[in-house]
Amino acid sequence: MTDQLTQTPLYGERAIAEAELICFDNPRPGRPYEVSIELPEFTCKCPFSSYPDFAVLRLIYQPGPRVVELKAIKLYVNSYRDQSISHEEVTNRILDDLVAATDPVWMQLEADFNPRGNVHTVVRVSHGTRQPC
């Protein structure tokens, strides 16, 4: 049996590389409700310096026909770890991919980046119109 620690790529890297935004049918499509997900360990790389950027992602959405599976979203956001991408672009791209996968009634993503060089950045993007719950 091959030791998973000596395989290249490692099992975690393979899981991230093969990740898809898996969704399942909304169990309560007739009821307005919100789902809130926080991902406190998001990382990507600065496109100018290549230094790592760290952020807390906060996703709030009102499901349409599909709900995103939690492990799938974790692996999906981990795929940005080695990508050189701006705060603004990564936040918009993640929202676009989640909207395409779930077709929500409303969705908002906030990326709260750790301060770097005495500058704190928060990027907030949304899609659709929020309904009362």
UniProtKB/Swiss-Prot annotation:
Task: Quote the catalytic residue positions.
Answer: 46, 53
Its recorded name reads: NADPH-dependent 7-cyano-7-deazaguanine reductase
* Pfam entry (one): QueF
Q: Which GO terms describe its molecular function?
A: preQ1 synthase activity
Q: Which UniProt keywords apply?
A: Cytoplasm, NADP, Oxidoreductase, Queuosine biosynthesis
Please give the catalytic activity noted in the UniProt record.
7-aminomethyl-7-carbaguanine + 2 NADP(+) = 7-cyano-7-deazaguanine + 2 NADPH + 3 H(+)
What is the species of this protein? Answer: Parasynechococcus marenigrum (strain WH8102)
Superkingdom of this protein's organism: Bacteria
What is the similarity comment for this entry? Belongs to the GTP cyclohydrolase I family. QueF type 1 subfamily.
Which EC numbers does the record give?
Answer: 1.7.1.13
Its pathway, per UniProt, is: tRNA modification; tRNA-queuosine biosynthesis
Q: Does the keyword Ribonucleoprotein apply?
A: no
Q: Which InterPro entries match?
A: GTP-CH-I_C/QueF (IPR043133), NADPH_dep_7-cyano-7-deazaG_red (IPR050084), QueF (IPR029500), QueF_type1 (IPR016856)
State the PANTHER family in the record.
Answer: NADPH-DEPENDENT 7-CYANO-7-DEAZAGUANINE REDUCTASE
